[in-house]
Amino acid sequence: MKKISLPKIGIRPVIDGRRMGVRESLEEQTMNMAKATAALITEKLRHACGAQIECVIADTCIAGMAESAACEEKFSSQNVGVTITVTPCWCYGSETIDMDPMRPKAIWGFNGTERPGAVYLAAALAAHSQKGIPAFSIYGHDVQDADDTSIPADVEEKLLRFARAGLAVASMKGKSYLSVGGVSMGIAGSIVDHNFFESWLGMKVQAVDMTELRRRIDQKIYDEAELEMALAWADKNFRYGEDQNAQQYKRNEEQSRAVLKESLLMAMCIRDMMQGNNKLAEKGLVEESLGYNAIAAGFQGQRHWTDQYPNGDTAEALLNSSFDWNGVREPFVVATENDSLNGVAMLLGHQLTGTAQVFADVRTYWSPEAVERVTGQPLTGLAEHGIIHLINSGSAALDGSCKQRDSEGKPTMKPHWEISQQEADACLAATEWCPAIHEYFRGGGYSSRFLTEGGVPFTMTRVNIIKGLGPVLQIAEGWSVELPKEMHDQLDARTNSTWPTTWFAPRLTGKGPFTDVYSVMANWGANHGVLTIGHVGADFITLAAMLRIPVCMHNVDDAKIYRPSAWAAHGMDIEGQDYRACQNYGPLYKR
């Protein structure tokens, strides 16, 4: 399939239009601000797919309606999905602003004394507020000289945070969520809400019955040569763990091989359904070759599939990872049990960071007292106040083992363009593939089993839908924790030792839902959550504001919270502001 062009960032240099000396004296400085902004973004950021970001600068500085319209015409023809307006001087507020109501927009007003860039910033933001088109304000903390072309650190932070979030918004627009199956075991997140996807994310929902997956497997609607490559890769890289099934449920070698083959086929077919595959067109299967333009997907599995066929654990784990038999590549976003709301949290995290996401059950809160009672050992270090056991049946991205390394040699999860083949191999080597427990999965399957290395910063998120309110976002920054082996083995065995585990310690604030670890668990809005690498809660907050999704729980420092300027007019408490502003403006794509 032909790739749909990626959204670009438009840079709008605006200027005082008075000729005979004023405009002429500002042209170079204004255009240099635009060029510096574009250079910063292209150097520091990439699309989630790894492609370089393109910035489009207006052909001329913008002084009024005519040049603003010319700029808009250029942007419309080049798929600009985000705009940043820059100026070092006074300009004519409402005459020069970006009026597209669905495009994220920011204004950087240069903090200098020679010309009043701050005055234009304030005037333009007032126009945005009055017209109901929110914009983000960027204004440096310290005064700069007029000939200073550097971008201060605080301005850079806001430019990049805005650009990351804005591109996420633009990248999701027009894509689809592929719902394979329906509601899994009554899980509310798998009651896929079309209005949420359409109104808040600008996406469609493609609903496909699981029989379509069955048809593709049975009728060989896949690349048969790729299947052989996938099987050979699995034979080389898969380490098999203990089969904990009773003797009557253990499978022989031939049966196990059939389960592995079908598990790999599920991964291939779900991928093809998401993004298409030209190899199918070569087989005369043109319709199937197109895919569904899906940027995220979910697979129901339980129980209508898994009571008879291999579960989705292997397929989901491999798709969500940054590598497979084709080498290192962009991870997909595939939600276990078709939990579309957790899938959206995964999608947001992937778009912001370019990394794989760890889907998990928020399974158990272990208090220090309970751990010591069960193991005879105290929790220490990051775990001293208690831990949350994040574990599911084996569909978490294998990157979650954290066998990749950052520039300082510390364990991490990296965007795929930074991952070496050796790091991918290390993640595979850290993973065991355990036969699925028959009582859970009568059709068999393999669950990935790994343990996340400790001391790694993570952000846990979840989207929930509240009747009468709409979607809300939860955020909990914290760290993975490494427990003594004997302690881990004892605690892990009490749940299911054939599944992947992350021991998570949220950062506590002593207030509200972050009073203690128990409160974090008690306030979590659903049975699932997502781990995104790094302390990136501030990026999630900015993105949520763009989409008009209020944040109902977070432990991000107030100084890092960055929302549109109009939020400040919705009260003095910043979280109440968020709720009132999101309600006032409504969903980004409201109809």
UniProtKB/Swiss-Prot annotation:
Provide a Gene Ontology MF annotation, just one: manganese ion binding
Q: According to the UniProt entry, what is the EC number of this protein?
A: 5.3.1.25
Q: Name one Pfam family in it.
A: Fucose_iso_N2
Which residues are named in the active-site annotation? E337 (proton acceptor), D361 (proton acceptor)
Which UniProt keywords are present, listed alphabetically? Answer: Carbohydrate metabolism, Cytoplasm, Fucose metabolism, Isomerase, Manganese, Metal-binding
Q: Which InterPro entries match?
A: Fuc/Ara_isomerase_C, Fuc_iso_dom3_sf, Fuc_isomerase_C, Fucose_iso_dom1_sf, Fucose_iso_N1, Fucose_isomerase, Fucose_isomerase_dom2_sf, Fucose_isomerase_N/cen_sf
Enzyme class name: isomerase
Gene Ontology CC: cytoplasm
Annotated Gene3D superfamilies: 3.40.50.1070, L-fucose Isomerase, Chain A, domain 2, L-fucose/L-arabinose isomerase, C-terminal
The UniProt entry lists the main location of this chain as: cytoplasm
A biological process term (GO) from this entry: L-fucose catabolic process
Q: Where in the cell is it found?
A: Cytoplasm
The UniProt record gives the binding positions of Mn(2+) as E337, D361, H528
What is its pathway? Carbohydrate degradation; L-fucose degradation; L-lactaldehyde and glycerone phosphate from L-fucose: step 1/3
Reaction(s) catalysed by this chain's protein: L-fucose = L-fuculose
Cofactor(s) for this protein?
Answer: Mn(2+)
How is the subunit organization of this protein annotated in UniProt? Answer: Homohexamer.
- Protein family according to the UniProt entry: Belongs to the L-fucose isomerase family.
Q: What does this protein do?
A: Converts the aldose L-fucose into the corresponding ketose L-fuculose.
Q: What is this protein called?
A: L-fucose isomerase
Annotated source species: Citrobacter koseri (strain ATCC BAA-895 / CDC 4225-83 / SGSC4696)
